[in-house]
Amino acid sequence: MIEVGEYKIKEGLYYTKEHEWVQVLEDGTVLVGITDYAQKELGDLAYVELPEVGKVVEKGDVLCEVESVKAVSEVYAPVSGEVIEVNEELADSPEKINEDPYEAWIAKIKPKNLEEELKELMDAKAYAEYLKTL
């Protein structure tokens, strides 16, 4: 784990400038969630609008929304592909993202252009450097 101030960054994941993370699984699918920075900035989450299974997204499309006491924030698809599973636990317990943002994934995506799109994402060290500029 890398720490930048109060924010934790899990190594081995890929990151976006919009504060989503991507974990590549052995079967080639990816888990997507929001970072520690994102959940701390949002505050206590009250609701996660999960995407529909079967939804096809392009990188940068709105994947879903998360709602906190402070704001409603869009979560963007960090990779293109099809949503093949969602974390149903978040429907009843959105606070799981606040408790452990790197375990509380939002969606599993079957990517269609992973190798190319990963090149455009940051690794943990690059994301840590990016956070220092905010």
Swiss-Prot record:
Cofactor(s) the protein needs = (R)-lipoate
Q: Which InterPro entries match?
A: 2-oxoA_DH_lipoyl-BS, Biotin_lipoyl, GCV_H, GCV_H/Fam206, GCV_H_sub, Single_hybrid_motif
- UniProt KW keywords: Lipoyl
Q: How is the cofactor bound?
A: Binds 1 lipoyl cofactor covalently.
Quote the cellular component terms of the Gene Ontology held in the record: cytoplasm; glycine cleavage complex
Where are residues bearing N6-lipoyllysine located in the sequence? K70
> In what residue span(s) does the Lipoyl-binding domain sit?
29-110
SUPFAM superfamilies per the record?
A: Single hybrid motif
BP terms from Gene Ontology: glycine decarboxylation via glycine cleavage system
| Pfam families linked | GCV_H (PF01597)
Lineage, top-rank taxon, reads Archaea
- Could you tell me what this protein does? The glycine cleavage system catalyzes the degradation of glycine. The H protein shuttles the methylamine group of glycine from the P protein to the T protein.
Which PANTHER family does UniProt cross-reference here? GLYCINE CLEAVAGE SYSTEM H PROTEIN, GLYCINE CLEAVAGE SYSTEM H PROTEIN-RELATED
Summarize the subunit comment. Answer: The glycine cleavage system is composed of four proteins: P, T, L and H.
What protein family is recorded? Answer: Belongs to the GcvH family.
Spell out the protein name for this chain: Probable glycine cleavage system H protein
Q: Which organism is it from?
A: Pyrococcus furiosus (strain ATCC 43587 / DSM 3638 / JCM 8422 / Vc1)
